[in-house]
Amino acid sequence: VQINSGVAVLEEEGVLLDKLVVKAASATLTAGTDYTAAFDDNGYVNIVVIPGGAGKSATSLTVSGVQIDPSAVTPADIVGAVSAAGVESGMECIRMIFPKLNMVPGILIAPGWSENAIVSAGLQAKTTRINGVFNCVCIVDIDSSTNGATKYDDVKQQKEKQAVTSANCYAVWLYAKVGDVLYAGSAMAAAVTVATDADNGDIPNVSPSNKTVPISAACLKDGTEVLLDQEQANVVNSFGVATWLNINGFRLWGNNTACYPGNTDPKDRWFSVRRFFCWDDNTFIQTYFQKVDSPANKRLIEALVDSENVRGNSFVSRGICARYELKYLESENPTTNLLNGCITFHKYMTPFGPAEDIEELVEFDPDALSTALAQ
């Protein structure tokens, strides 16, 4: 590799920096002492020769190492497993997020892979009871390759073929194109979703649907552009699948989770409501975990009820929920449960759903003519 102005550019993608072997003539250079290596915006490796190092007078470098091969990855690798030795891989590593980082997964995605039925099934399964207690959602792609749905009216059949049915799943059809670069719909939809959360105080009560996104086209996996009008996009939505719609700029279009239309329960079908339920449950667990193993007395019960209802009143006053109230009901806490150290609280929660249809009724009033012309 030729050195120009102290920098050698290795024009290869997927190179592992910690496996690089860099030589100047016959001398092997040491990372951090003789050179530094980093990726540029193209994914190439920039090797900077350090003045005073062993390669200071070199005009070229000999570079070898390990390069990843994305084509060798299989759906089974993405789903993962637990080996006989207890080593976790793929989606099995989701379990490790909270104990390692103390962060609860919010959205699971596998761009470029979730259009595979095995992967999408794995993602849906992993959204519930993470670490035994937490819940989240996933965003998956409906296959738009030649083997999938290439027309909007094929989406229903392809969704069923992929077995995408979970209330914790948001399905997206079509890739997004920015310039000449294609992005999986699931990746772009996830970005729109978290951006919407950030614009609303990190509370996931607002639907990402109808939020503009800076893309230049919606397309099939092979890059073929697809122009959907609102009527066609609504048909896709009726299958429980979101897509991209261009009305004064591209926007994500669709409020329903993948359980729709088979399940029309508002807490399950609306993506924003479903996410709010997951988020609120996870927040409750994290907030009051410190109370676990405290004396199960009246003071503990009142503290939890009062604290949660103060929070709930804030949600109601800000128009986030129509109702948010926590109660301790004696009927749900028999003596046998209390003796076993189990306390149950009952929460009444109604986050506002999206205004998916706004209709106008227009009436012609003939009497207004005579009134207007009366002398």
Predicted feature locations:
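Extended beta-strand solenoid/passenger and fiber regions
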Residues: 1-57, 64-70
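A glycine- and small-residue-enriched flexible loop/hinge signal that marks low-structured segments
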Residues: 84-287, 329
